[in-house]
Curated annotation (Swiss-Prot):
SMART domains given in the database record: GATase_5
Boundaries of every Glutamine amidotransferase type-1 domain copy: 5-225
Catalytic activity: N(2)-formyl-N(1)-(5-phospho-beta-D-ribosyl)glycinamide + L-glutamine + ATP + H2O = 2-formamido-N(1)-(5-O-phospho-beta-D-ribosyl)acetamidine + L-glutamate + ADP + phosphate + H(+); L-glutamine + H2O = L-glutamate + NH4(+)
EC numbers: 6.3.5.3, 3.5.1.2
Top-level lineage group: Bacteria
Signal sequence range: none
Predominant localisation class: cytoplasm
GO cellular component: cytoplasm
Pathway: Purine metabolism; IMP biosynthesis via de novo pathway; 5-amino-1-(5-phospho-D-ribosyl)imidazole from N(2)-formyl-N(1)-(5-phospho-D-ribosyl)glycinamide: step 1/2
Function: Part of the phosphoribosylformylglycinamidine synthase complex involved in the purines biosynthetic pathway. Catalyzes the ATP-dependent conversion of formylglycinamide ribonucleotide (FGAR) and glutamine to yield formylglycinamidine ribonucleotide (FGAM) and glutamate. The FGAM synthase complex is composed of three subunits. PurQ produces an ammonia molecule by converting glutamine to glutamate. PurL transfers the ammonia molecule to FGAR to form FGAM in an ATP-dependent manner.
Organism: Synechococcus sp. (strain JA-3-3Ab) (Cyanobacteria bacterium Yellowstone A-Prime)
Protein name: Phosphoribosylformylglycinamidine synthase subunit PurQ
Spans through the membrane: none
Subunit description: Part of the FGAM synthase complex composed of 1 PurL, 1 PurQ and 2 PurS subunits.
Amino acid sequence: MAKVRFGIVVFPGSNCDRDVAWVTRGLLGCPTRLIWHRETDLSGLDVVVLPGGFSYGDYLRAGALARFAPVMGSLAEHGARGGYVLGICNGFQILTEAGLLPGALVRNANLHFICDRVGIRVERQDLPWTSAYPCGATLTLPIAHGEGRYVCDADTLKQLQDRGQIVFRYAPVAPNGSVDNIAGICDPSGRILGLMPHPERAADPDLPGQDGIPFWQSIVQSLAG
């Protein structure tokens, strides 16, 4: 069985790239390449991850500068060719800034940085990202963000709801004020996913809280199968 090949983009200010690599390479045994933001070669990769952190210091707003990095053009092409793209926290913010996912991530409703473990409900179980979870399962995953409140206009929200693009919701309620309790969404194809919670921070078998492990197992099993 062929191994799923991961690429993890590293921006100045990224701080979760090694955490993701520990899971993909160390836990799952998948070939994993760290990709500097100035690189443009994404050939041979199945899944490209935009990790959490504070890309370019999050100056202007989260993800606003990272969208112009040389790697982002190649990332869009990777997605258009049918490749898989995952944005976690700051990565989700970058995907919305780049127009690869709709809506925006703005300041939390309480105007404070939130670092906590929260309930996350799985709304779609039929995606490669979530196939190892039962639909409707409630997970406990870490969040850590100051600009994590998902917003969009009414028409976009209706489209997300009607097309089944809401993959994760906060449960019972969004701590950051996200519209419709949205914690993660995908594009219409289901291949591009952005979420604010950190599944890589809940994937160490030696630490309490392992609800993130099935997330990573899902994409590996789906693509390898």
